[in-house]
A protein has these predicted regions:
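Conserved small/polar residues in nucleotide/adenosyl-binding loops
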Residues: 142-149
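N-terminal, Lys/Arg-enriched amphipathic/low-complexity engagement segments
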Residues: 1-45
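Glycine/charge-rich, flexible interdomain linkers and switch-proximal surface loops
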Residues: 135-140
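Glycine- and charge-enriched low-complexity intrinsically disordered segments
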Residues: 84-123
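Phosphate-interacting basic helix/loop segments used at nucleotide- and nucleic-acid interfaces
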Residues: 123-124, 130-134
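Acidic, glycine-anchored pre-beta loop/turn
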Residues: 46-52, 82-84
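Generic structural motif
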Residues: 25, 36-40, 52-55, 64, ...
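Short hydrophobic beta/alpha edge segments that flank linear recognition/processing sites
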Residues: 53-66, 81, 89-97
Length: 150
C-alpha cells in the first residue's frame, strides 16, 4: 500500500526558534527500580555505602542465576529500599565520577553464541531482553537467533 501526500499543512508560526542548546545540570542520584524487572527475585550483591562503577553488578535473579542487573552510574550506593514482603523497590546511587567496568569481548565474527551470551549477562545487557507476552526477563540459558527473515 502506497500513500502519496498531495498537499501539506503550513502552520503560520511567526519568528524563529532560539538557536541555543541548554546544558543540563548534572544528576546527583540515580535509581534502579525493582518494578522495571517483572518476576525478578533479587539477591543483592552490594550493600549501602559500597562504591560502584558503571557496570558493577547490583543484584542477581535468585530464580535465574546469571541474570545480573548492573549499575547505570558510578558512585556510592546510598539506599536499598524494600517494600512489602521485602520486595525490591529501588537501589539508589549517589553519582560521583564516571568510572566504568571493562568487559572482555571478542570480535563478532569470531565469537560463539555462548561468548556473546556470557558478555551480555556480565555487562547487564541481558535484562534489556523481554519475553512475550508478559514482558519478563528471559532465563539465562535462552537460545537466541539473530538472522534475517523475509
Amino acid at each position: 500500500m502506497l500513500f502519496k501526500i498531495k498537499k501539506g499543512l503550513d502552520i503560520p508560526l511567526k519568528g524563529r526558534p532560539d538557536e541555543r542548546i541548554d546544558v543540563a545540570t548534572d544528576v546527583k542520584t540515580v535509581a534502579v527500580l525493582g518494578s522495571d524487572y517483572i518476576g525478578l527475585k533479587p539477591t543483592m550483591l552490594v550493600r549501602e555505602g559500597d562504591q560502584v562503577k558503571v557496570g558493577t553488578p547490583l543484584f542477581e535473579d535468585k530464580k535465574n542465576p546469571g541474570v545480573i542487573v548492573t549499575s547505570p552510574a558510578a558512585g556510592t550506593v546510598a539506599a536499598i529500599n524494600r517494600g512489602a514482603k521485602r520486595a525490591l523497590v529501588s537501589v539508589v546511587i549517589a553519582v560521583d565520577g564516571d568510572e566504568a567496568e571493562a568487559f572482555a569481548c571478542k570480535e563478532v565474527a569470531a565469537a560463539s553464541e555462548a561468548d556473546v551470551r556470557k558478555v551480555m549477562q556480565e555487562s547487564g545487557l541481558w535484562v534489556a531482553f523481554r519475553t512475550r507476552p508478559y514482558g519478563k526477563i528471559p532465563v539465562s540459558y535462552t537460545h537466541l537467533r539473530a538472522h534475517e527473515t523475509s
